[in-house]
Amino acid sequence: MPSARGKSKSKAPITFGDLAIYFSQEEWEWLSPIQKDLYEDVMLENYRNLVSLGLSFRRPNVITLLEKGKAPWMVEPVRRRRAPDSGSKCETKKLPPNQCNKSGQSICQKLVSAQQKAPTRKSGCNKNSVLVKPKKGHSGKKPLKCNDCGKTFSRSFSLKLHQNIHTGEKPFECSNCRKAFRQISSILLHQRIHSGKKSHECNKCGESFNQRTTLILHMRIHDGKEILDCGKALSQCQSFNIHQKIHVVGNVCQCRKCGKAFNQMSSLLLHKKIHNGKKTHKYNKCGRGFKKKSVFVVHKRIHAGEKIPENAKALSQSLQQRSHHLENPFKCRKCGKLFNRISPLMLHQRIHTSEKPYKCDKCDKFFRRLSTLILHLRIHNGEKLYRCNKCEKVCNRHSSLIQHQKVHTKKKKLFECKECGKMFSGTANLKIHQNIHSEEKPFKCNKCSKVFGRQSFLIEHQRIHTGEKPYQCEECGKAFSHRISLTRHKRIHTEDRPYECDQCGKAFSQSAHLAQHERIHTGEKPYTCKTCGKAFSQRTSLILHERSHTGEKPYECNECGKAFSSGSDLIRHQRSHSSEKPYECSKCGKAYSRSSSLIRHQNTHSEEKA
């Protein structure tokens, strides 16, 4: 039956040739090492899949070449052997040298006979040999020219691939994260991040990798091979350095300007860009720097009071978001913080997950960062590397030394921002800070209509309304909406209070708190109420007082709806719902929800003694 025959033809089995992709020498040289690795992975995987299906066909030459580590466009020299079986319609023969006098390679030529043109599937060519045709490149003719840079190509494929560099076209988009790529090989490699596929496994320790090159570098750890110095071959010894520093405390890459330590030279080089001022376009009025001249120009227009046209609103918004969306595309889903690279984001996320993968073998303490573990191990080794030139105190961290030295420099005058009360050690820092209050504020809170100059400030502010507190203290479990609040809180546990009052000796963890405390001795009250003229030593006290005139009560209880003028009053009130009594008498164990109630109770014990 004719219809049956036609049906059988349409169900012909798939062959390796249907899935294979072949490159000429010129096209192969265009590929990067990562793309070549990807090509090898895909071809070998396709071959294994077909074999696993039980399909019978000859081993393709391209697979043999790839397994031997040779370039897939090369063809092995033809051995003297018997002609292939009658089922194959392919022959491999060496062309006479005069047919290609500039190429010294053997060329596999497929000879198609009249019988091969028959419509039946069986008479097709089953031999998957890699064809390398005599190239136009030998004659020196490259008819295809790039109009942008004048570079010539012998194939339209190569020209199109090259032109994407000039046009910036990235036609291949990842469906998971919308990241775009110029070449399909790049997107295939990228998608392994989402799929978690790691096809290259170490046969010694079982660790898997996305790329073959990474596996080869990893194998050097087991082989114990000498790795070149970081400065000479950083890209080749990076994996070894990471692994080595888990076991060896030494050779820490340290920034000479700020003392920050890194476990990789590449991380240090990236960090140094902060100090070397890579933002070449700096505006003198506010001190801000910009990488792009176009953004710098728009920023100057805002200072000049020039109105940005309606059609340039998007550009103005991108200016405000430059440090977040343009330069920091990676966002934390928990707290909204933005990062310029995925690796700092992954490190940051450990704050929320409490993941601490690095363990100290001596005291079983765990750490989020390898660099922190390395610094911690110095405590066990008795190392104290940083000495104060004022009092000879030694610290094992440069950051601790800087913090300590503030004790000696505390007498320097602090400059306060009249808008928010924040303190600064110099007028230059205060001036830069004051731009926050004067600049355009396009980000508005939909709850209270407060406006902000940066999206990150808005995200932090909105936590007041949502009650979200993503930063938790590991010591006592107390949670905070801002990371800086957690950092300050941790000083309670470490008892690190470098700021001491000259009058009474009381110490503080923050310079701003010391400045506020010193007003008790001086009697200074710089904050005056415009309504009644009452003066206060702290701005927060003035804000709370002003609410008595306005009747504003922004803090509302979720349980009963009662509102309060201060957050502390709300916290005290909420204890009536939770029955929480954190203030306990050390003598009789009786507990209270308010500290004032505890003080009154403790007076009864003192009266009994009397």
Curated annotation (Swiss-Prot):
Location in the cell: Nucleus
Keywords: DNA-binding, Metal-binding, Nucleus, Repeat, Transcription, Transcription regulation, Zinc, Zinc-finger
Keyword Phosphoprotein part of the UniProt annotation: no
Zn-finger segments (C2H2-type): 144-166, 172-194, 200-222, 253-275, 281-303, 330-352, 358-380, 386-408, 415-437, 443-465, 471-493, 499-521, 527-549, 555-577, 583-605
A single Gene Ontology CC term: nucleus
A single MF term (Gene Ontology): RNA polymerase II cis-regulatory region sequence-specific DNA binding
KRAB domain mapped to chain residues: 14-85
Region (Disordered): 119-139
PROSITE patterns named among the record's database cross-references: KRAB, ZINC_FINGER_C2H2_1, ZINC_FINGER_C2H2_2
Domain of life: Eukaryota
SMART domains: KRAB (SM00349), ZnF_C2H2 (SM00355)
InterPro entries: KRAB (IPR001909), KRAB_dom_sf (IPR036051), Znf_C2H2_sf (IPR036236), Znf_C2H2_type (IPR013087)
Principal localisation: nucleus
Stretches of the chain forming a coiled coil according to its record: none
Biased composition annotated in UniProt, kind: Polar residues: 119-129
The keyword ATP-binding belongs to this UniProt entry's keyword annotation: no
Gene Ontology process terms (BP): regulation of transcription by RNA polymerase II
Job description of the protein: May be involved in transcriptional regulation.
Similarity section: Belongs to the krueppel C2H2-type zinc-finger protein family.
Protein name: Zinc finger protein 667
The species this protein was found in: Homo sapiens
Lineage, broadest ranks: Eukaryota, Metazoa, Chordata, Craniata, Vertebrata
Gene for this chain: ZNF667
